[in-house]
Each structure stands twice: as structure tokens, then as C-alpha cells.
């Protein structure tokens, strides 16, 4: 005796087969190693706190740099990224957070905020991130970070501007070595931007003091 085939049973079987087929044709997501931006430990300086406050803003950048991809220029004007690796945050956020942390560690500016909090401040450090990538020079490779920094007062008037550019050679082409190179280049650039910001803000604040 044959069992009658119920229409509902056939429908379930067809649905299951379709689901299995869909699963087989969907591409598997490629696993990625997520990297933080390395930093070297710094010692806070013993100095009189600055009488002014600072807001550190995320620098503007191109769509290519404003992503978690680790950018690389293998040749000419070709921009690519390392396969299976990415940053923990987009490059502009990484640099902003590195600068903010550097000011905290330095200790000379104690009233610090970021553009995420949107708090009022005497000065704002921002600008444009023009390069944050590794570049091949023949068989050699180096990390390049280029920041057009801009310091503005609380009326959004530009107080000072300057281009900072760092080239950090990388001995190994492995991603981990390249990431370490980004950390070294960021430390160098951060130290330069920090000192420049303190000098320019202090000079402007002394020339136009508030609450006096």
C-alpha cells in the first residue's frame, strides 16, 4: 500500500531543497585580521597646564581612506588594500584618536575633547588626511602619512595651518610589519603635530587672552 503524498509535505521538501541550494551558492565571507594602530609608550611631561581647551576633530579624507581597509599603492597610481586584514576603525578615526591620546599623555593640555562630543573649546585641531597608506618603491616599501593640519579658534577662524608628512621604511612586506610601520609613522607625525599645536595655540591665546 502506498502512502498518499500530501501537498503540504511536497511544499516543505521543495522549500528545503531551495534553501540548501541558496546556501551553496552564497559566497563565504572572507575572514579578516583586525589591527589596532600600534603606539610606543610615552612619558607625560611635567609642565604648567595650558589655560585653553582643545577639541580634536576627525580629519576629512577621500572615500578610499575613510574606511577600515589598510591601503597600499603597489605601483603607479593604483590604490589597493591588503587582503584579509583591516583596521579597527577608519584611518581618520585612528589618527584622531592617536592625537587625542597623545595630548592626554603629554599633559600640557588638560581640557581636551573630540568632535564626537561636540563640546565647546577655545581651539579645534582638524584638517585633511591626504595619505595613510603603504607604498612600494621598487623592491622597497614604506608607510606614508600626510596630514594638512589646521588649527581654528572658537569662531572658526583659522589660526594656523601646516602640512605634516612622514615616510617610514618597512623592512618586511608582511602585513604585521606594515602595521608596525604605520605605528612608528603615526608616533612621529603625532609628536610633530602636538608640539606645533601647543606652540600655535599658546601664541594666539597669549595675544588674545580670554576672561581678562
Question: What are these model-derived regions, one by one?
Answer:
Residues 1-13:
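Bacterial N-terminal signal peptides that target proteins for export
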Residues 19-22:
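C-terminal motif of bacterial Sec signal peptides marking the signal peptidase cleavage site
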Residues 25-47, 101, 106-155, 172:
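Surface-exposed short loop/turn segments
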Residues 50-52, 66-68, 75, 83, ...:
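Envelope-exposed proteins and targeting segments
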Residues 59, 128-132, 165-167:
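Generic short beta-strand segments
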Amino acid at each position: 500500500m502506498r502512502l498518499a503524498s500530501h501537498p503540504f509535505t511536497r511544499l516543505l521538501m521543495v522549500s528545503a531543497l531551495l534553501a540548501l541550494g541558496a546556501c551553496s551558492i552564497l559566497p563565504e565571507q572572507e575572514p579578516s585580521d583586525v589591527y589596532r594602530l600600534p603606539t610606543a609608550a610615552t612619558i607625560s611631561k611635567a609642565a604648567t597646564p595650558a589655560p585653553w581647551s582643545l577639541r580634536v576633530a576627525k580629519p576629512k579624507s577621500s572615500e578610499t581612506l575613510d574606511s577600515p581597509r589598510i591601503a597600499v599603492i603597489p605601483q603607479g597610481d593604483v590604490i589597493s588594500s591588503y587582503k584579509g586584514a583591516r583596521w579597527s576603525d577608519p584611518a581618520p578615526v585612528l589618527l584622531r584618536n592617536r592625537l587625542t591620546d597623545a595630548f592626554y599623555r603629554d599633559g600640557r593640555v588638560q581640557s581636551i575633547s573630540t568632535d564626537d562630543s561636540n563640546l565647546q573649546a577655545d581651539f579645534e585641531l582638524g584638517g585633511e588626511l591626504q595619505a595613510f597608506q603603504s607604498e612600494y618603491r621598487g623592491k622597497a616599501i614604506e608607510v606614508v602619512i600626510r596630514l594638512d593640519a589646521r588649527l581654528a579658534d572658537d569662531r572658526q577662524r583659522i589660526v594656523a595651518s601646516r602640512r605634516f608628512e612622514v615616510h617610514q621604511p618597512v623592512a618586511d612586506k608582511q602585513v604585521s610589519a606594515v602595521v608596525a610601520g604605520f605605528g612608528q609613522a603615526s608616533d612621529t607625525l603625532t609628536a610633530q603635530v602636538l608640539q606645533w599645536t601647543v606652540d600655535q595655540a599658546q601664541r594666539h591665546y597669549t595675544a588674545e587672552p580670554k576672561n581678562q
